Design a protein with these regions (language model features):
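N-terminal amphipathic, basic helical "cap/leader" segment at the start of enzyme domains
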Residues: 1-73, 78-79
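Small-aliphatic-rich amphipathic alpha-helix that forms the alpha element of a beta-alpha
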Residues: 33, 75, 84, 90-131
Length: 131
């Protein structure tokens, strides 16, 4: 499938099949994130892969939604603000832009692998920090 077909096919998925994700499919998604362009190739993203039932339950708790994660894996895209490219004219660290690019690449790769995906930004970071 070409890029336009892939972009048209990608959509937000909120209910997932009750079957495991093939390791090679997960690796392909992670590799897409690694290949994504970032400011001066600093690669400030840190990707946490959550697959255990306990970890997925904690993610649901952080979203204040016990039904939030029927997925078999959740990828948390984080940024290291000490390892990002900083614009010289205003001192702004572009880690959020970089993380967004990485996430977009990974969402498209998930679609290419036949996996459903959902970009979620509604979560309580304090709950995640404690856990």
């Amino acid at each position: 499938m070409n890029f336009t077909e892939l972009a048209k096919k990608r959509c937000s998925v909120r209910a997932y099949a009750d079957k495991p994700i093939a390791p090679e499919h997960l690796q392909a998604v992670l590799e897409a994130g690694r290949l994504a362009p970032t400011g001066k190739n600093h690669q400030p993203q840190r990707i946490l892969v959550v697959q255990s039932p306990e970890g997925l339950a904690k993610m649901a708790q952080a979203m204040h939604n016990t039904n939030a994660y029927t997925a078999k894996a959740v990828l948390m895209i984080c940024s290291d603000t000490t390892d990002c490219w900083v614009r010289s004219f205003d001192g702004h660290c572009i880690h959020e832009i970089d993380a967004s690019i990485v996430t977009t690449y990974m969402l498209l790769a998930a679609t290419e692998q036949g996996l459903g995906s959902l970009w979620v930004e509604r979560f309580d970071t304090e709950i995640l920090r404690k856990e």
